[in-house]
A protein has these predicted regions:
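GST-like domain detector, emphasizing the conserved glutathione-binding G-site
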Residues: 1-129
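Positions that flank functional sites
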Residues: 33-34, 160, 209-210
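Phosphate-coordinating loops and pocket residues in cytosolic domains that bind phosphorylated ligands
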Residues: 46, 196, 205
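Short beta-strand(s) of the beta-wing in winged-helix/HTH DNA-binding folds
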Residues: 54-57, 155, 201
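Residue-level recognition of oxygen-bearing side chains
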Residues: 69, 186, 199
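Active-site-flanking alpha-helical
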Residues: 75, 170-171, 204
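GST-like fold's C-terminal all-alpha helical module
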Residues: 99-196
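Terminal-tail/helix-coil boundary detector
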Residues: 200-216
Length: 216
């Protein structure tokens, strides 16, 4: 069984959702909303010195951090789930491109947003502008990604991949779905489709309940 260090509404939800689709046993061993402060981060530092989520501990006890790395590793361990283009497949390069883009360009903004003092120190007067600029940056990145894709049923074609799950979870965070739908109309129907997957209905309700305010 896989063990996860995670939190409801966090990046671990993408990992958990993929494991649900794969029908692979797992448990959230430690629930730690790290954005709530040092006490929560202290629950994670024994396995990740960066004190960040998610963390996956394999059945052999190996620790894997970084959401994209975990998702890619899981697709290699469970190829029968068919949640990633195979090496040599026509969509493989774009799959790897966007799986890397999300943590590099988008996910990283939330380290700043969760606690603006990490960048601005005690100068609280600049917090609102910092939050606005990071939200604008996230929206711009979604727009860039949308402009480079031609989704079908899913982002890369007719077959769902972990990329679809990754985008569905990350697009629920600030600046939220309303703006996401505005700047990324091509991806909008895909994330709505993943929101509505029957296989994940109970899971979403438990780990990242749908908020009607997301819809524009």
């Amino acid at each position: 069984m896989y063990n996860i260090y995670g939190a409801a509404g966090s990046g671990s939800v993408a990992i958990e959702a993929v494991l649900e689709l794969m029908e692979v046993p797992y448990q959230v061993l430690v629930e730690a909303p790290t954005w709530e402060g040092e006490a929560e981060r202290a629950k994670v530092t024994p396995v990740n010195p960066m004190a960040q989520l998610p963390v996956l501990v394999t059945t052999q006890g190996e620790v894997i951090t970084e959401s994209a790395a975990i998702l890619l590793w899981l697709t290699e361990q469970h190829p029968e789930a068919n949640l990633a283009p195979k090496p040599g497949c026509a969509t493989r390069a774009q799959f790897l491109r966007w799986m890397s883009f999300i943590p590099a360009a988008i996910y990283s903004m939330y380290w700043v947003r969760d606690e603006p003092e990490r960048i601005a120190g005690d100068n609280k007067a600049v917090y609102p502008e910092l939050l606005q600029r990071t939200a604008d940056r996230v929206a711009h990145c979604w727009h860039v990604m949308d402009s480079q894709l031609t989704p079908q049923l899913f982002l890369l074609g007719q077959q769902m991949s972990v990329l679809d799950i990754y985008v569905t979870v990350a697009s629920r965070w600030t600046p939220g779905r309303r703006r996401f739908y505005q700047v990324a109309p091509g991806m909008a129907e895909v994330v709505r489709r993943v929101d509505g997957l029957v296989q994940l209905k109970d899971f979403w309700a438990r780990r990242f309940p749908f908020n009607t305010d997301w819809d524009g």
